[in-house]
C-alpha cells in the first residue's frame, strides 16, 4: 500500500511539474482567474485509427491545442492485445497507466510491462509503441508535446507479434 502511495505521489508531482511549466507559458494568452472546464459527459470516445493501431482501441481526446499551451492530452483504452504502430513524437510524450497492464517498447529493444501508476517518458524523436497486454485491457492518460509545425506524431510501421511478445524479464 505504501508503495502505491509513493507511486501516486510521484505521478502527481510529475503532472504538477509538467502543467506548472505549461501554466507559465500560457500566462500571456489565458486571462487571469479563468480556465477551460470540460464536464466528463462532454468527452466522447472515438475508435482509434485502424491504420496506426493493431487491435481494438478507443481514444478520449481531453484537450486540443490551446494557444500558449504546447501540449494536448487524452485517454487511450486498449483492449487485450491492442497496440499502436511504431511512432515518434517530435516534441515528446509521457503517459501514465491508469488501469490494467500493458507493454511499451523502444525500437530495437525488448518491450517492458507497465502497470497502474507507472509513468513512461518518451523524449522527442524516440521510436516506440505502447498498448495492452495480451490478456488484459490497459487504460492510459497521455500528455503529448505540440510541435511548432503542428504535427504531434509521426506514424511508422506496424509492431510485429515477435516485437510485441519479446519482453524484458
PLM features per residue range, with description:
Residues 2-12:
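Bacterial N-terminal signal peptides that target proteins for export
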Residues 11-21:
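Bacterial N-terminal signal peptides
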Residues 24-70, 152-169:
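A short, N-terminal "cap"/entry segment at the start of jelly-roll beta-barrel domains
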Residues 73, 135-154:
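A short hydrophobic beta-strand segment most commonly corresponding to one strand
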Residues 75-79, 88-104, 143-146:
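Short, conserved beta-strand element in jelly-roll/cupin
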Residues 86, 104-105, 127-133:
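Short beta-strand His + acidic residue motifs that chelate non-heme Fe in jelly-roll/DSBH
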Residues 108-125:
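Short acidic-glycine-tyrosine-enriched beta hairpin
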Amino acid at each position: 500500500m505504501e508503495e502505491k502511495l509513493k507511486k501516486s505521489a510521484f505521478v502527481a508531482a510529475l503532472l504538477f511539474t509538467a502543467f506548472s511549466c505549461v501554466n507559465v507559458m500560457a500566462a500571456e494568452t489565458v486571462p487571469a482567474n479563468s480556465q477551460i472546464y470540460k464536464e466528463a459527459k462532454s468527452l466522447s470516445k472515438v475508435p482509434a485509427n485502424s491504420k496506426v493501431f493493431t487491435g481494438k482501441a478507443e481514444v478520449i481526446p481531453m484537450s486540443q491545442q490551446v494557444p500558449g499551451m504546447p501540449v494536448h492530452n487524452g485517454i487511450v483504452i486498449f483492449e487485450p492485445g491492442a497496440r499502436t504502430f511504431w511512432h515518434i513524437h517530435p516534441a515528446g510524450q509521457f503517459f501514465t497507466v491508469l488501469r490494467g497492464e500493458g507493454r511499451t517498447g523502444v525500437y530495437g529493444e525488448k518491450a517492458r510491462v507497465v502497470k497502474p501508476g507507472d509513468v513512461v517518458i518518451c523524449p522527442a524523436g524516440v521510436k516506440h509503441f505502447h498498448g495492452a497486454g495480451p490478456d488484459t485491457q490497459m487504460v492510459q492518460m497521455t500528455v503529448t508535446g505540440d510541435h511548432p509545425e503542428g504535427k504531434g506524431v509521426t506514424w511508422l510501421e506496424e509492431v510485429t507479434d515477435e516485437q510485441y511478445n519479446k519482453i524484458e524479464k
